[in-house]
Amino acid sequence: MTVTYSSKVANATFFGFHRLLLKWRGSIYKLLYREFIVFAVLYTAISLVYRLLLTGVQKRYFEKLSIYCDRYAEQIPVTFVLGFYVTLVVNRWWNQFVNLPWPDRLMFLISSSVHGSDEHGRLLRRTLMRYVNLTSLLIFRSVSTAVYKRFPTMDHVVEAGFMTTDERKLFNHLKSPHLKYWVPFIWFGNLATKARNEGRIRDSVDLQSLMTEMNRYRSWCSLLFGYDWVGIPLVYTQVVTLAVYTFFFACLIGRQFLDPTKGYAGHDLDLYIPIFTLLQFFFYAGWLKVAEQLINPFGEDDDDFETNWCIDRNLQVSLLAVDEMHMSLPKMKKDIYWDDSAARPPYTLAAADYCIPSFLGSTVQMGLSGSDFPDEEWLWDYEKHGHRHSMIRRVKRFLSAHEHPSSPRRRSYRRQTSDSSMFLPRDDLSPARDLLDVPSRNPPRASPTWKKSCFPEGSPTLHFSMGELSTIRETSQTSTLQSLTPQSSVRTSPIKMPLVPEVLITAAEAPVPTSGGYHHDSATSILSSEFTGVQPSKTEQQQGPMGSILSPSEKETPPGGPSPQTVSASAEENIFNCEEDPGDTFLKRWSLPGFLGSSHTSLGNLSPDPMSSQPALLIDTETSSEISGINIVAGSRVSSDMLYLMENLDTKETDIIELNKETEESPK
């Protein structure tokens, strides 16, 4: 019984809705005319009593009562209460329509999945669809008054063809105090499984699709049952109803026209018909009637759902789809656009105005001038001139204590080709902690204050870049890693260290006359750092003044002589200067001991020639048959870059560094 007027409002015209105001079926006039007549009669009766039956004193008292009712009737929040209530009811009404059970998807699946053109196959398909329609009928019969009037008993259901006599006996035999709308679902599932076992449903995927769609259909039916069971709370409906009718009961007295000779505010005119009061009643009471009509769409109102039509339509269409249309196909022919790649159906003369070109986007017609295209230096110009910051950002920048550089720096972009920091960390000289302290892949940069404390003023900075290193040749691990028993005079480290080649760093100093001792200073402590406890070989002991060697005992107890303060400032400033070898093309000479069997490294810091601009950084290698391990005996400050490179000499770029826990005893 739904009132359809979509065709009348298809186009927005001048007074387009005026034709709808004259309809009676489903209109507000049909719903409200009784209440409206009652309100008008009561208002007229009270007005006649005031004007004709009351005495002077009684009129004065009524007038005070009327002013009081008119003043405080507006305190009732009718608009607020009605607005929320009607919104809730309309949403609930539309959700119930969306969840009406439609068997179209199931009939498509049954027609294509249950095979067999014989009588048994036809019986299977029709029975499955009859169970589907029986389920919706049982739900509609329990929630809709119109459907219940059509099928008041189960005999009427059997008579209508939705259920056979045997099925009715089985249905009635099931003793359940609950609504048994779910019984046809069980029958559907059992019959579909039987059809799968018989081969009528050839694939388990098709059976699963049928069950999934049937579960969705069951969800629709159960949702309708839930809407019928749990409605809008009664207290809300009562509040809305009382608010509306109490307001208009107060209006019956408060909106009366009083004697204008008494000079009451707002009562200058004496009219007999309260036009705006009647309109207010029409709107508010009509608003409430909308909620009353939509709160249960399965009734018999003009705008309720056509459930009986749904039952008839679903049964007729579903049986037609699974029976007569099963494997019924029209003959295939070539369409009229067979040789035309751009199919374009014709337009009639009445629809010629709707033939429009395709929409390609809103920016198709937008053009840009040549000045809008950026050149190659657009990024540099953008950074040079700066952003256009908002006012808030400018205020923050003004209040900030951070000083921005006067000229912007050009940003440099670089692609990282390999994880070179795994072997050469990018940090500057850092205090050597222990060999297990492996630098991270992205070590933090050293602070400027630390750099200033490590390097004397005016001394050149060492550059450990990849371009300044000589070629590093890979050697086998067995040729360099051997066992070594530390000397008894040297305190062994409690931490087991990885076996790496021996590295000895000594200082090449200028011939300074001394009284039989070596000048040891904290600033030059790095010059006398020895990484092994092995006694130096003869070739090592025969080095000239450019390669003097200190034993561990000499490091711990420097001999007597001039104090460390007597060392010249020039010697301290040239600690890390490098001596240039005329026969070498590199600024520094690096000779790694992996391919010699052992290593003996000396670091030269003082150049005898004061005019040399780059004193030597000497790393010499000597052969020693006893050397095969490493042990830290001095806590001097050593470059972590150099230390980490020497520890992982045999490690390739894709290897995983492991700590060798095996130790071999060697003769002391």
Swiss-Prot record:
Its main location: membrane. Residues 532-545 have a biased composition (Polar residues). It comes from the Eukaryota. Residues 425-436 have a biased composition (Basic and acidic residues). Residues 475-489 have a biased composition (Low complexity). GO terms for cellular component: chloride channel complex; plasma membrane. It is found in: Cell membrane. Present in skeletal muscle and weakly in brain, spinal cord, bone marrow and retina. Residues 52-60, 256-274 are extracellular. GO terms for molecular function: intracellularly calcium-gated chloride channel activity; ligand-gated monoatomic anion channel activity; metal ion binding. It catalyses: chloride(in) = chloride(out). The chain crosses the membrane at residues 32-51, 61-82, 238-255, 275-288. Keywords: Calcium, Cell membrane, Chloride, Chloride channel, Ion channel, Ion transport, Membrane, Metal-binding, Transmembrane, Transmembrane helix, Transport. Residues 400-454, 473-493, 532-570 are annotated as: Disordered. It holds the Pfam family Bestrophin. One of its GO terms (biological process) is negative regulation of monoatomic ion transport. Ca(2+) binds at A10, Q293, N296, D301, D304. Ligand-gated anion channel that allows the movement of chloride monoatomic anions across cell membranes when activated by calcium (Ca2+). Belongs to the anion channel-forming bestrophin (TC 1.A.46) family. Calcium-sensitive chloride channel subfamily. This is Bestrophin-3. It comes from Homo sapiens (Human).
